[in-house]
Amino acid sequence: MSFTPSHIKLYQNGELKQRAETAFQILQSCKSCPHNCKIDRTNNEFGFCRSGNLPIVSSYTAHYGEEPVLSGTRGAGNIFFGNCNLRCMFCQNFEISQNWKVEREHEISSEQLAQIMIELQKRNCHNIGLVSPTHFSATILKSIYLAVEKGLSLPIIYNTNGYDSVEMLKLYNSVIDIYLPDLKYGDNQSAKTYSKIDYYFDEAKKAIKEMFNQVGDELVYDGDVVVRGLIIRHLVLPNGLAESEKVFKFIAEELSRHVHISLMSQYYPSNKASNDILINRPLRESEYEKTIELMEKYGLYNGWIQEVESSESYRPYFSEDRVNPFKDYKSSSSSFPKEGT
Protein backbone atom coordinates (compact mmCIF):
# COMPACT_ATOMS: atom_id res chain seq x y z
CA MET A 1 0.00 0.00 0.00
CA SER A 2 1.20 3.50 -0.82
CA PHE A 3 -0.48 6.01 1.49
CA THR A 4 -0.85 9.67 0.54
CA PRO A 5 -1.67 11.92 3.52
CA SER A 6 -4.79 14.01 2.96
CA HIS A 7 -2.97 17.22 3.88
CA ILE A 8 -1.26 16.98 0.47
CA LYS A 9 -4.61 17.50 -1.26
CA LEU A 10 -5.51 20.33 1.13
CA TYR A 11 -2.26 22.05 0.20
CA GLN A 12 -2.87 21.60 -3.51
CA ASN A 13 -6.36 23.12 -3.43
CA GLY A 14 -5.36 26.04 -1.19
CA GLU A 15 -7.44 24.92 1.80
CA LEU A 16 -4.43 24.26 4.04
CA LYS A 17 -3.17 27.83 3.68
CA GLN A 18 -6.63 29.23 4.45
CA ARG A 19 -6.94 27.10 7.58
CA ALA A 20 -3.50 28.17 8.78
CA GLU A 21 -4.54 31.81 8.44
CA THR A 22 -7.83 31.18 10.26
CA ALA A 23 -6.07 29.34 13.08
CA PHE A 24 -3.55 32.10 13.65
CA GLN A 25 -6.35 34.63 14.12
CA ILE A 26 -7.57 32.58 17.09
CA LEU A 27 -4.42 33.65 18.99
CA GLN A 28 -5.62 37.26 19.06
CA SER A 29 -8.27 36.19 21.57
CA CYS A 30 -6.88 32.80 22.42
CA LYS A 31 -9.28 29.87 22.36
CA SER A 32 -6.69 27.24 21.42
CA CYS A 33 -7.93 25.00 24.24
CA PRO A 34 -10.90 24.88 26.64
CA HIS A 35 -9.23 27.35 29.02
CA ASN A 36 -10.48 30.05 26.65
CA CYS A 37 -8.05 32.59 28.12
CA LYS A 38 -9.05 35.08 25.39
CA ILE A 39 -5.76 36.94 25.69
CA ASP A 40 -3.83 38.29 22.71
CA ARG A 41 -0.86 35.99 22.33
CA THR A 42 0.25 37.88 19.24
CA ASN A 43 0.86 40.87 21.55
CA ASN A 44 2.97 39.09 24.20
CA GLU A 45 0.06 38.36 26.53
CA PHE A 46 0.28 35.05 28.41
CA GLY A 47 -2.52 32.81 29.64
CA PHE A 48 -2.53 29.49 31.47
CA CYS A 49 0.07 27.88 29.19
CA ARG A 50 2.51 30.81 29.56
CA SER A 51 3.20 30.71 25.83
CA GLY A 52 3.29 33.35 23.12
CA ASN A 53 2.58 33.02 19.43
CA LEU A 54 5.87 31.30 18.52
CA PRO A 55 6.14 27.52 18.95
CA ILE A 56 8.49 26.22 21.63
CA VAL A 57 10.34 23.09 20.54
CA SER A 58 12.09 21.51 23.51
CA SER A 59 13.38 18.49 21.61
CA TYR A 60 12.92 16.52 18.42
CA THR A 61 14.13 13.04 17.63
CA ALA A 62 13.43 9.69 16.02
CA HIS A 63 11.58 8.08 18.92
CA TYR A 64 11.26 4.32 19.39
CA GLY A 65 9.16 4.34 22.54
CA GLU A 66 5.70 4.80 21.05
CA GLU A 67 3.31 1.96 20.29
CA PRO A 68 5.11 -0.42 17.90
CA VAL A 69 2.71 0.40 15.07
CA LEU A 70 3.83 4.04 15.30
CA SER A 71 7.55 3.68 16.02
CA GLY A 72 8.03 0.87 13.53
CA THR A 73 11.65 0.10 12.70
CA ARG A 74 12.74 3.65 11.89
CA GLY A 75 11.15 5.60 14.72
CA ALA A 76 8.41 8.18 15.02
CA GLY A 77 9.63 11.67 14.15
CA ASN A 78 8.59 13.23 17.43
CA ILE A 79 8.61 16.96 18.08
CA PHE A 80 8.23 17.76 21.79
CA PHE A 81 6.62 21.14 22.44
CA GLY A 82 7.47 23.02 25.62
CA ASN A 83 5.00 24.26 28.24
CA CYS A 84 1.52 22.78 28.62
CA ASN A 85 -2.13 23.60 29.21
CA LEU A 86 -2.27 21.13 32.13
CA ARG A 87 -0.34 21.05 35.42
CA CYS A 88 -0.12 17.35 36.22
CA MET A 89 1.50 16.66 39.59
CA PHE A 90 2.98 13.43 38.20
CA CYS A 91 4.03 14.67 34.73
CA GLN A 92 6.90 12.59 33.39
CA ASN A 93 7.90 15.41 31.03
CA PHE A 94 7.75 18.10 33.73
CA GLU A 95 11.25 19.36 32.85
CA ILE A 96 9.82 20.85 29.66
CA SER A 97 6.10 21.12 30.43
CA GLN A 98 6.27 23.10 33.69
CA ASN A 99 9.42 25.17 33.35
CA TRP A 100 8.14 28.00 31.19
CA LYS A 101 10.87 30.56 31.88
CA VAL A 102 13.51 28.17 30.58
CA GLU A 103 11.39 26.84 27.74
CA ARG A 104 10.76 30.34 26.38
CA GLU A 105 14.42 30.25 25.34
CA HIS A 106 13.49 27.51 22.86
CA GLU A 107 11.01 29.54 20.85
CA ILE A 108 11.46 29.14 17.12
CA SER A 109 9.79 30.49 14.00
CA SER A 110 7.14 28.70 11.98
CA GLU A 111 9.71 28.32 9.22
CA GLN A 112 12.17 26.63 11.58
CA LEU A 113 9.48 24.23 12.80
CA ALA A 114 8.69 23.35 9.19
CA GLN A 115 12.36 22.65 8.59
CA ILE A 116 12.45 20.30 11.59
CA MET A 117 9.63 18.30 10.02
CA ILE A 118 11.61 18.07 6.79
CA GLU A 119 14.73 17.00 8.70
CA LEU A 120 12.83 14.19 10.44
CA GLN A 121 11.54 13.05 7.07
CA LYS A 122 15.11 13.00 5.75
CA ARG A 123 16.05 10.83 8.74
CA ASN A 124 13.58 8.32 7.33
CA CYS A 125 11.13 8.47 10.25
CA HIS A 126 7.77 6.84 9.61
CA ASN A 127 5.74 9.90 10.58
CA ILE A 128 5.76 13.32 12.23
CA GLY A 129 4.62 13.15 15.86
CA LEU A 130 3.39 16.42 17.37
CA VAL A 131 3.79 15.83 21.12
CA SER A 132 1.79 18.15 23.42
CA PRO A 133 0.76 20.44 20.54
CA THR A 134 -2.53 21.77 21.91
CA HIS A 135 -1.40 25.19 23.14
CA PHE A 136 0.46 25.77 19.84
CA SER A 137 -2.23 24.28 17.62
CA ALA A 138 -3.03 27.71 16.18
CA THR A 139 0.55 28.18 14.96
CA ILE A 140 1.50 24.62 14.00
CA LEU A 141 -0.86 24.64 11.03
CA LYS A 142 1.28 27.31 9.37
CA SER A 143 4.37 25.17 9.85
CA ILE A 144 2.62 22.16 8.35
CA TYR A 145 1.68 24.27 5.34
CA LEU A 146 5.27 25.45 4.93
CA ALA A 147 6.60 21.92 5.38
CA VAL A 148 4.27 20.46 2.74
CA GLU A 149 5.42 23.26 0.45
CA LYS A 150 8.98 21.98 1.02
CA GLY A 151 7.99 18.39 0.27
CA LEU A 152 6.66 16.90 3.52
CA SER A 153 4.74 13.74 2.66
CA LEU A 154 4.65 11.81 5.96
CA PRO A 155 1.54 11.06 8.03
CA ILE A 156 1.11 13.44 10.97
CA ILE A 157 0.31 12.31 14.52
CA TYR A 158 -1.49 14.61 16.97
CA ASN A 159 -0.26 13.34 20.37
CA THR A 160 -2.28 15.28 22.93
CA ASN A 161 -3.38 15.31 26.56
CA GLY A 162 -6.99 15.45 25.37
CA TYR A 163 -7.82 18.95 26.67
CA ASP A 164 -8.41 20.30 23.17
CA SER A 165 -10.71 22.79 21.53
CA VAL A 166 -13.24 21.25 19.14
CA GLU A 167 -13.04 24.44 17.07
CA MET A 168 -9.31 23.94 16.57
CA LEU A 169 -9.69 20.22 15.89
CA LYS A 170 -12.13 20.97 13.08
CA LEU A 171 -9.41 23.04 11.42
CA TYR A 172 -7.16 19.98 11.63
CA ASN A 173 -9.68 17.71 9.89
CA SER A 174 -7.85 15.92 7.03
CA VAL A 175 -4.59 17.53 8.17
CA ILE A 176 -3.99 15.04 10.97
CA ASP A 177 -3.77 11.41 9.94
CA ILE A 178 -3.42 9.78 13.37
CA TYR A 179 -4.96 11.05 16.59
CA LEU A 180 -3.19 9.85 19.73
CA PRO A 181 -5.02 11.47 22.67
CA ASP A 182 -4.68 10.72 26.34
CA LEU A 183 -7.91 10.21 28.20
CA LYS A 184 -6.36 10.81 31.58
CA TYR A 185 -9.37 10.80 33.87
CA GLY A 186 -12.96 9.63 33.89
CA ASP A 187 -13.81 12.21 36.52
CA ASN A 188 -13.59 16.01 36.60
CA GLN A 189 -12.64 16.16 40.28
CA SER A 190 -9.60 13.90 39.94
CA ALA A 191 -8.41 16.06 37.06
CA LYS A 192 -8.85 19.18 39.15
CA THR A 193 -6.90 17.67 42.04
CA TYR A 194 -4.00 16.17 40.13
CA SER A 195 -3.80 18.25 36.93
CA LYS A 196 -5.21 21.60 38.13
CA ILE A 197 -7.73 21.62 35.32
CA ASP A 198 -11.47 22.37 35.20
CA TYR A 199 -13.97 20.05 33.52
CA TYR A 200 -11.28 17.83 31.99
CA PHE A 201 -13.45 14.77 31.40
CA ASP A 202 -16.27 16.80 29.90
CA GLU A 203 -13.97 18.66 27.52
CA ALA A 204 -11.83 15.65 26.62
CA LYS A 205 -14.92 13.64 25.72
CA LYS A 206 -16.02 16.35 23.29
CA ALA A 207 -12.55 16.57 21.77
CA ILE A 208 -12.12 12.82 21.35
CA LYS A 209 -15.59 12.51 19.84
CA GLU A 210 -14.47 15.02 17.21
CA MET A 211 -11.30 13.02 16.54
CA PHE A 212 -13.40 9.86 16.23
CA ASN A 213 -15.77 11.58 13.82
CA GLN A 214 -12.80 12.52 11.64
CA VAL A 215 -10.94 9.19 11.45
CA GLY A 216 -13.30 6.52 12.82
CA ASP A 217 -12.36 3.36 14.71
CA GLU A 218 -10.37 1.54 12.03
CA LEU A 219 -6.58 1.67 11.87
CA VAL A 220 -5.19 1.94 8.35
CA TYR A 221 -1.79 0.33 7.84
CA ASP A 222 1.00 0.76 5.33
CA GLY A 223 2.95 -2.42 5.92
CA ASP A 224 3.36 -2.82 9.68
CA VAL A 225 2.94 0.88 10.49
CA VAL A 226 -0.33 2.73 11.09
CA VAL A 227 -0.88 5.70 8.77
CA ARG A 228 -4.41 6.72 9.78
CA GLY A 229 -6.70 6.25 12.73
CA LEU A 230 -7.36 6.84 16.42
CA ILE A 231 -5.51 5.33 19.39
CA ILE A 232 -6.64 6.41 22.86
CA ARG A 233 -4.06 6.23 25.62
CA HIS A 234 -4.99 5.75 29.26
CA LEU A 235 -2.43 5.83 32.05
CA VAL A 236 -3.53 3.79 35.05
CA LEU A 237 -2.99 5.65 38.34
CA PRO A 238 -2.56 4.23 41.85
CA ASN A 239 -5.65 3.82 44.02
CA GLY A 240 -8.00 4.02 41.04
CA LEU A 241 -7.60 7.79 40.83
CA ALA A 242 -7.92 7.86 37.03
CA GLU A 243 -11.49 6.51 37.32
CA SER A 244 -10.66 4.05 34.55
CA GLU A 245 -14.03 2.33 34.44
CA LYS A 246 -15.74 5.58 33.47
CA VAL A 247 -13.17 6.04 30.72
CA PHE A 248 -13.91 2.58 29.30
CA LYS A 249 -17.66 3.07 29.62
CA PHE A 250 -17.43 6.28 27.58
CA ILE A 251 -15.34 4.67 24.86
CA ALA A 252 -17.55 1.60 24.58
CA GLU A 253 -20.92 3.35 24.73
CA GLU A 254 -20.27 6.73 23.07
CA LEU A 255 -17.54 5.87 20.55
CA SER A 256 -17.06 2.23 19.55
CA ARG A 257 -15.91 -1.04 21.05
CA HIS A 258 -13.55 -1.31 18.09
CA VAL A 259 -11.51 1.74 19.11
CA HIS A 260 -7.88 0.88 19.84
CA ILE A 261 -6.69 1.57 23.37
CA SER A 262 -3.13 1.81 24.64
CA LEU A 263 -3.39 0.94 28.33
CA MET A 264 -0.29 2.17 30.10
CA SER A 265 1.28 0.94 33.32
CA GLN A 266 4.33 3.23 33.19
CA TYR A 267 3.22 5.48 36.06
CA TYR A 268 5.89 6.40 38.56
CA PRO A 269 5.86 9.25 41.13
CA SER A 270 7.53 11.95 39.07
CA ASN A 271 7.48 15.73 39.49
CA LYS A 272 5.48 16.60 42.64
CA ALA A 273 3.77 13.24 43.10
CA SER A 274 5.99 12.27 46.02
CA ASN A 275 4.19 14.93 48.07
CA ASP A 276 0.81 13.18 47.80
CA ILE A 277 0.27 10.00 49.79
CA LEU A 278 -2.19 8.59 47.24
CA ILE A 279 0.16 8.78 44.24
CA ASN A 280 3.65 8.65 45.79
CA ARG A 281 4.33 5.07 44.69
CA PRO A 282 4.46 3.06 41.44
CA LEU A 283 1.43 1.19 40.21
CA ARG A 284 0.83 -2.23 41.73
CA GLU A 285 0.45 -5.24 39.47
CA SER A 286 -2.91 -6.04 41.05
CA GLU A 287 -4.18 -2.54 40.22
CA TYR A 288 -3.16 -2.89 36.60
CA GLU A 289 -4.66 -6.36 36.26
CA LYS A 290 -7.94 -5.10 37.71
CA THR A 291 -7.96 -2.28 35.15
CA ILE A 292 -7.44 -4.75 32.31
CA GLU A 293 -10.44 -6.70 33.59
CA LEU A 294 -12.53 -3.51 33.56
CA MET A 295 -11.50 -2.81 29.98
CA GLU A 296 -12.54 -6.32 28.95
CA LYS A 297 -15.81 -5.92 30.88
CA TYR A 298 -16.80 -3.24 28.36
CA GLY A 299 -15.80 -5.37 25.38
CA LEU A 300 -12.67 -3.37 24.56
CA TYR A 301 -10.13 -5.79 23.13
CA ASN A 302 -8.34 -3.79 20.43
CA GLY A 303 -5.04 -2.22 21.35
CA TRP A 304 -2.04 -2.79 23.57
CA ILE A 305 -1.18 -3.31 27.21
CA GLN A 306 2.21 -2.60 28.74
CA GLU A 307 4.30 -4.80 30.95
CA VAL A 308 3.94 -3.70 34.57
CA GLU A 309 7.71 -3.13 34.74
CA SER A 310 7.44 -0.39 32.07
CA SER A 311 7.66 2.29 34.78
CA GLU A 312 11.33 1.41 35.13
CA SER A 313 12.15 1.88 31.46
CA TYR A 314 10.18 4.93 30.31
CA ARG A 315 11.93 7.86 31.98
CA PRO A 316 12.86 10.87 29.87
CA TYR A 317 15.77 13.13 30.86
CA PHE A 318 15.23 16.40 29.03
CA SER A 319 17.40 18.39 31.44
CA GLU A 320 20.40 16.15 30.70
CA ASP A 321 20.09 15.63 26.96
CA ARG A 322 17.58 17.39 24.74
CA VAL A 323 18.91 15.70 21.61
CA ASN A 324 18.31 12.21 22.99
CA PRO A 325 16.20 12.47 26.16
CA PHE A 326 15.14 8.82 25.93
CA LYS A 327 18.63 7.33 25.72
CA ASP A 328 17.92 4.88 28.56
CA TYR A 329 14.59 3.78 27.11
CA LYS A 330 14.51 0.02 26.63
CA SER A 331 12.93 -0.15 23.21
CA SER A 332 11.05 -3.39 22.67
CA SER A 333 7.80 -4.40 21.10
CA SER A 334 7.09 -6.29 24.31
CA SER A 335 6.45 -2.93 25.98
CA PHE A 336 3.00 -3.18 24.38
CA PRO A 337 2.73 -6.96 24.12
CA LYS A 338 -0.91 -7.73 23.43
CA GLU A 339 -3.06 -6.62 20.54
CA GLY A 340 -6.66 -7.72 20.45
CA THR A 341 -8.77 -8.74 17.50
Place the predicted regions along the sequence by residue.
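Anionic-ligand binding region
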Residues: 192-222
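A cross-domain feature marking catalytic cores of carbohydrate-active enzymes
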Residues: 81, 132-134, 158-162, 183, ...
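Conserved Radical SAM active-site core
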Residues: 45, 49-178, 187-188
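Short glycine-enriched, charge-decorated loop/helix-capping segments at active-site entrances
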Residues: 95-105, 193-198, 275-282
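Non-cysteine beta-strand/loop elements that form the S-adenosyl-L-methionine
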Residues: 173-188, 258-267
